[in-house]
Amino acid sequence: MSDIEIKSSPPESPAEEQEERRLAGRKRARAVDPDEEDDDTQVVNNQDEENNPKEDDGEEGGNAQAEGADEGEDDEDEDEDDDDDDEDEDDEDDDGERRAKRRRKQKKFRFLDVEAEVDDEDEEEDEDNDYGDVAEFIDEAPEDVGARDDHQHRRLNRVFGRNEEEDVHDIVQRLKERHAGAARYNGDSDAVPQRLLMPGVNDPSLWKVVVKSGREHAICASIFRKVFAQQYSANPIDVISVFCRDSIPGMIFIEARQSASVSAAVNGIVGIFMSRGVNLVPIEEMAPLLKMKKKDVNLTPGMWVRMKRGKHAGDLAQVVDVDQITSGVVGIKFIPRIDLTPREKRKERIAIGKPGGVRPPARLFAYDDVRKIYGRQSVRQGAQGSYLFDNDEYVDGFCIKDVKIPAVATEDVNPTLEEISRFTGDDDSTAKFDLSAIADANKNLSTSLLFPGDKIEVYEGEQTGLYGIVEAVSPDVIAIKAEGGEVHGQTVEVPARSVRKRFDVGEHVKVLGGKHTDASGMVVEVKGDIVTLMSDLGEQEIKVFSKDLRKAADTTNLTVTKGLYDVHDMVMLDSTTAGVVTKVEGGLLRILDQNGAAKSVSPEQVSIRRDNKRFAVATDSQGNDMKVGDNMKETDGEMRQGEVFNIFRSIFVFLYNREYTDNFGVFVARANSLISVTPKSAVNDLTKINPALNQQLPYGGASLMPAPTANLNRNRLINTLVVVTKGTSKGLIGVIKDVQGENARVELKHNNKTLSVNLASLKRKDQKTGATFPLEMAGIASAAGGYGARPNAGQYDINPYGGATAMHPSMGGQTPALMGGRTPAARFGQTPNPYAAGVQNGKTPNPYAAGVGGKTPSAANASGGKTPAWGASGGKTPAYGMASGGKTPAYGMQGGKTPNAYAMAPPGPSGGRTPAYGAYGRPEASGSRPSVMAPPSAPYSAPYSAPTPAGNGAPTPAIPGNPYTAPTPYGAPTPYAAPTPGMPSLSAPTPGPGAGIAPTPFGAPTPYGAQSYGASAQQQRGLPWDWALDFRNVIVEIGPSYRPGSRNPLHFKRGFFDGKRFGYNDIIGENVRAILLDDPSVVEEIPAEYLRPAKADSQGQVVVVIGGGPEQKGQQRTTQYENGGSWMMELEGGDMAPLVVDGADLCRIWKV
């Protein structure tokens, strides 16, 4: 037996042996492994052979003392021993079966092999021979069967362990379950549950403030500086934070506990509309305002993007490389913009003050062109035909560049067919190239291009093939009314990304974008997203994307045909821009607009042609009339001269001179900068028509109205404090040192530098208040006072809406503001002063005041005056806007004679009256009321202005509701106690019972303002008949036509809609497509000559200024206070004083 087997001897004590046997009995029987079967069999056989001698030895040892026994007994004993051996072997077999189930290993030895190996049979034989000499010396105890079975069970356990090995995932899961414990709250941890961050009622509130759009960031920075500056002062501003969102323009948000803190923070900051108030943001809306929605940008090669920054902003580009997209860089290909202007011209352009960074046009890279301008060394040739110029790589004419991902826009790219075609190498839209390769860029139709009523179809998804009419549009879902199929007539919602516009062959469509914008034609072919149409002009095929088309309106009467336009025709490019045709070339028109810009447009881009040569008239720089056919020349600038062939709005004059090559001999100039080449007589001396203007002062004094010079005495402008309002020096303050023609030499205060500035770019600045006024007032206005001015009058009144304090000392006898002429009046009213000067000094002519801008001109050359006076433009007696000459208005615009100032009896029925429409059955209708004028023998009562004709021919006031009536009530005596400053002996006779003279200074404003047949208040106020074509989204009223020479009926649809109010947004030629406010289902196309503005009738209404000067026209304001027909508007940011506008110059806005 080997030494290893000896080490596996039975247990030392019987107790341990019994315990081992008990544990072995619990073990389950095992199936013998085939690989171990031979070894096990051999081991069992060896054990059987060894057991027999051991038993014999034991038997000899046990019976050593029984010598001499009989052999018969030995045989019996041997038989008994054999039986016992058989029984022992059976017991051992039973014990072996029970011990087949070995005990389980300890956990610490599960993955360790701690069993000793058993030597093979040959080694055992060698060891037996080696120990043969001492074989009898060693007392070999009988082997325990359990040790043998233990070895076999261990081997078997390793086999079962491999089969029953657990899965790795199961082990990991069990370890997680074992070690995972409940997370305990750590008071020192920085992690805060999200629900604890939500604002509550005890947290500071969030307030929103309305600001000027585009200045949100600047205003936030101003609030920061203001809060920090007052942080350690006695009254710090309790504002916690302020921010704005780019997605919410015109709004900033301030975090504070009280609204008073917000008001203190924004007070005095320009650009904040405090009239809108400070509004509290609800708690549930506070958290979403701070959420930043991050959008994942998915860029793929071939994708179309647009560049955001630099000179390529807005240019189309194509993604070519996304290898570095993880680093935030993407490679794009785009058409470069290289400035190929010669160096000499660039230097000249910079020297004369023109901007040097002009954006060059987009064109493909050309090596020869770049080399000529920048030199051979500036361009290097790279591999595979590429070029390197200015650190950029150019391949096939395109620039290949790596840019940051935020520098490109991936949404709403909407490339046009013309833009994409340039990437294919052909700019012609009719070229033969594969449209399917570029149509994928326009599959996703932007919902901004869809409107209710458009016909669309679904081209992908579960609803492919479904088509219908759009009913509602949202950012992601479009509701359509299905046509055809099982869902016919039902409203179905489809995803916006899966639809495209649908057009049928034969439909008349209009192009919305691209090179052929506004072109119209008939659809001849539809192929996927590409629609081919036959243009109405030129009969050429145009290919465009379906997204760039829309069904055209019925344009039967407006369809442009070839040959409709001729050279020098005036056309309208939009509602406010006019131009003349300088050349007709093929299907394009070369046009020079009113601003002097030349452009090529298609006839589809022209709204309408204006044929106004017969009625066009304007006034030149000397006050003389000019008309078509006159030869004029410029008074400044290039001193060009030419023949007038058209005039737009009496401001822009188009002239032609065949000697000029630019724009084919056509140029445009302003009327006030022209003078006649041939001498003309002075303007009509209207004093001969009205002898009352030549009356002498009492007691033989000189004439009250001497003829002044036509131009302003510009020497008075010297040493006047002015501010520059235009040009590169805008905002600088200086003093005029000299006046040379139309320019003034201004010495700037901040650096004593002298500049030459045009007078039109200067305004006078008050040293005390900082207010600015027109420059002409420096030579016109005098110090405060004069006849009628209150002495030592303050600048402002306590009552903001009334009083008689002059607004500014230089305004003369105004009570109290610029726009007056009324007694009593609001703060902005004024009463004429016969000896004081001022802007808009009064409605009645003042012989001693220049009255620049006044409604009724005085002795000076006042632009816009309507009552005749020396040098007055137009010299007209009627109310505002009468277009004909110095005539007293009457029916049919036929002038009548002003009654004889010296006549004591009414003139005859057909002469000497101021005719007016509508006698209303009065017996004095065809004549004049007896004059209250005194004969020449009584000079003390002689008036010094035109007598006011009596009778209903010129009632004072005229018919009720007329905005131009005189403020003296007709039929009642003028109160003698009226506190109107003036000189009684110079007062005009105000009509009324009795022959007394009211203390009204220098005549009442009594131009006849009654509604005449065929003319309306708009025409009298200066509003042209087509005023409505300059505005949109306004409310209008329908009335009789007031277009001169109109061939349309007097009433629109026989007066069915007279007095009704409409709102409109669409303009079609000279018509508007308007919706009846009382019944939105009624839509009418109404000519502009029937439209009148809807007047404001209450405060808080949003209106637009449709008349007045260019600085006011077009402004949108909110009415605040009304007095005497004029409205004061709410203050807005940047206002120096309240804006007051005559109610006749306002029109209500339709949709706010």
Curated annotation (Swiss-Prot):
What family does the Swiss-Prot or TrEMBL record give for this protein? Belongs to the SPT5 family.
Keyword terms, alphabetized: mRNA processing, Nucleus, Transcription
Main localisation: nucleus
Q: Which gene is annotated as encoding this protein in its UniProt record?
A: SPT5
Extract the PANTHER family matched here: SUPPRESSOR OF TY 5, TRANSCRIPTION ELONGATION FACTOR SPT5
- Compositionally skewed regions (Acidic residues) per UniProt: 68-95
Q: How does it assemble?
A: Component of the SPT4-SPT5 complex. Interacts with RNA polymerase II.
Q: Name one GO molecular function term.
A: mRNA binding
Supply the SMART domains for this chain. Answer: CTD, KOW
Q: Which InterPro entries match?
A: KOW, KOW_Spt5_1, KOW_Spt5_2, KOW_Spt5_3, KOW_Spt5_4, KOW_Spt5_5, NGN-domain, NGN_dom_sf
CC annotations in GO: DSIF complex
Localization, per the record, is: Nucleus
One GO-annotated biological process of the protein: mRNA processing
Q: What is this protein called?
A: Transcription elongation factor SPT5
Q: Which SUPFAM superfamilies match?
A: Translation proteins SH3-like domain (SSF50104)
Q: List all Low complexity biased stretches.
A: 939-966
Disordered as annotated region, ranges: 1-104, 906-966
